[in-house]
Amino acid sequence: RTAEQTENLLVNTHATFRWKHGLFPAFDHDQMTALDADLYITLVDNVDAIHERLIREHDVPHTLKDILVWREEEILATEVMSRIIRGHGCFFVVSRGVERDTALSVYRLLFERNRRKVYPSFPMTHVINVPQILTQIDLFRNALTEHFITFDPGDMDEKRLLYEAGAATQRGERQFNIEVNNRRLTFSVDQVTSVADDIDGQIYARDFKLIDQSDMIVSFIP
């Protein structure tokens, strides 16, 4: 088998897929058990970034709600699979990153297993318009990334969609434009506000997941 002849093996696959509105597993349990992977990682990204890639690279009818559901299904299915096959502590959620590349965290999870895992805690919502504090926060985050595996809540920013939708509503507009993956996209205010509770709920749940998979929380209080 390839796995037996390879020192380091990465398997890139979905845990689930949908076909004709049905949900199906995208893996064979016997094969995954035989493979007995050391680590299971679900890479996640902002809903607007996934939407942009879908319309650019694939012909897949979808809504923002669909993307949020698919993402949650992937996380849950992968975690369940990892626990059944490998046990607790072998599954991680890692963000692709908005302003920074998180590939280093993945590398360290794979090859520097003794390095401590950290959840950086810092103010976000209430300091958006305070540049001096934002600079301090960036220095804090960068310092942690230099020394630890970081599961940074700031590596995803879906609140931006909700803020932009709210601003458009105040202007009396039904659509708004934002830049996503270096491309200007138009979003419907109604479509974004219809998933506001889902976005907030998943942010809340994801933060707990990132904390749970960390060894410690390091807080910055400006």
State the predicted function of each range.
Residues 1, 5-6, 17-21, 25, ...:
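Conserved catalytic or regulatory cores that recognize and/or transform ribose-phosphate-containing ligands
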Residues 30:
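A mobile, often basic/glycine-rich helix-loop segment
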